[in-house]
């Protein structure tokens, strides 16, 4: 068996596995969601076009039935992705920080990515029907944090000064 570089595992293999788990858990969560939408509590199951993503993480479905299984799957999937993102972004300064400016930009981007990842996990553990304000805070800040991360990492990419070593990946 070929030696697996640990950086390759954390930057390529683990994120792929996490993505598969995320999709599988979300699809299963949609399948077991009891039903109801914001405008029609009588609908059966989860509607991709009429339910909010966060409905799967609610304590009770929009039709009033308990939503425990879907809620657990929702929290698990967001936790898996959040932990994977934290691990991934902690390796980026080593990969992209080939000069002082890139190193600083990558670390600042990483800090925002960690913030976004924590917010992702927080979204999974704050059901919107039980603790609405914290849920919205976490959900909104996923996007705010990752926007800053994407901007900073784009600057590194656009500058073209991001040569990486073959040994890292």
Residue ranges and their predicted role:
Residues 15-18, 22, 74-77, 81, ...:
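Hydrophobic alpha-helical transmembrane segments of polytopic
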Residues 42-66:
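Extracytosolic (periplasmic/ER-lumenal) interhelical loops and adjacent juxtamembrane/interface segments
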Residues 60-94:
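Individual transmembrane alpha-helix segments
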Residues 84-112:
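Cytoplasmic juxtamembrane regions at transmembrane-helix boundaries
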Residues 112-153:
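Membrane-proximal helix-loop-helix units in multi-pass membrane proteins
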Residues 156-164:
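Conserved small/polar residues in nucleotide/adenosyl-binding loops
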